[in-house]
Amino acid sequence: EWTRPIYFSTTVGSDYYMSLENNFQLEGLAYRIVPYGGKNGSFINTDIMYDKIMNDFRWGGMDKNPDMYLDETCRRMCSTLRSTFNQLASELIAEGKTEKAQKVLQKCIEVIPYSVAPYEIIMLYVADNFYKCNDEKNGDLVLNTLIKDYGESLIWSKKLGRYNMRTNYQENAYYSEEIQRSLL
């Protein structure tokens, strides 16, 4: 009898999962262990996750204070949260629920605004999902912001000089490939 659920945080390293990944059900920021397994590892209960993200979670007021300062740890958590939004949206799209997916993506850019937490690479996938939901306006907004930031990063890297520019080469090459891939 599974009367008391057991959860693992999504931020815990996979080394601690004790080979239970096939029995993980993603419900927001936690994996719930369930007695049945997914086909290829963990799976998402979109109904539970949608309700938690859209109604239960509190977002700390980032959307109300564009001057809020986030330290590096908080900015990394914003990336984790954006990834969670995107995972849910991807699964909703796969289920044919594009209207709900679009609402999830819209909430993502509203509650974790660019002004407080600049976009990172996960936002390419958010932009792609906006396009899959036929929301070209928001897809373009996110993608154009990423392209602008990437261009500014390249200009900054060039000013570092040839030797120091090499340290940023790998990251810049990765971003360039991902942006090109998203434009196809």
Regions flagged by a language model, labelled:
Residues E1-L184:
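ER/secretory pathway lumenal C-terminal domains and tails of membrane proteins involved
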